[in-house]
Curated annotation (Swiss-Prot):
GO terms for cellular component: endoplasmic reticulum; endoplasmic reticulum membrane; serine palmitoyltransferase complex. This is Uncharacterized protein C119.09c. The keyword Endoplasmic reticulum applies. One of its GO terms (biological process) is ceramide metabolic process. It is a multi-pass membrane protein. InterPro entries: ORMDL. It comes from Schizosaccharomyces pombe (strain 972 / ATCC 24843).
Length: 186
């Protein structure tokens, strides 16, 4: 079942993912992590800009949506998608590494967990730029500012090195493989 040290106490708000075992480290080093290495490919950074532009055009094309609301919806949609993709889902959809990444989110898998790499910096700065643009184009409306800043914090806080491999309120429990939900203590 597991040792008592890996059990989450009921009063704990933050749990820490255990350090990888020697077997996990060997499995992680045995093959390329296809789940997260795409962020270093040519065009991977551009697709974020294309997605933001497409979201902006889609929301602007809806007749009842104002320009200000279109920017806020673009911001919220991109931030929610980014949060789910990088910080909510754990594991990999591929079985190539013996389950070495099953407890890690995609953000924790990026660049083998190294901090301050170019890809991580880009993915950290892009939401800030989108927030600044959406705040500017909403003409600094107070309510939209609060919504946009909340979305920014929800995406930026999990990216900080201080919360690397930590789970706040135990919310990241979604695994990509159904057979792993019972076998891995989270």
């Amino acid at each position: 079942m597991g040792s008592s040290s890996s059990r989450r106490r009921s009063s704990s708000l933050v749990t820490k993912v255990p350090k990888p075992t020697i077997d996990d480290r060997l499995d992680q080093g045995s093959a390329t992590n296809y789940n997260s290495n795409w962020v270093n490919y040519k065009g991977a950074w551009v697709i974020h800009i294309v997605l933001i532009a497409a979201l902006r055009l889609i929301f602007h094309a809806i007749p009842s949506v104002s320009r200000e609301l279109a920017w806020t919806l673009t911001n919220l949609t991109y931030m929610a998608g980014s949060f789910i993709m990088f910080h909510w889902v754990t594991g990999t959809p591929f079985e190539f590494n013996g389950g070495a990444y099953d407890r890690l989110t995609m953000w924790e898998q990026l660049d083998e967990g190294n901090q301050y790499t170019p890809a991580r910096k880009y993915l950290l700065v892009l939401p800030i730029i989108l927030f600044l643009m959406s705040t500017h184009y909403t003409h600094y409306n107070g309510w939209m500012f609060l919504v946009n800043i909340w979305a920014l914090f929800m995406v930026l806080i999990p990216k900080l090195p201080a919360v690397h491999r930590k789970r706040i309120f135990g919310i990241q429990k979604l695994s990509l493989r159904d057979d792993d939900n019972d076998s891995i203590p989270r």
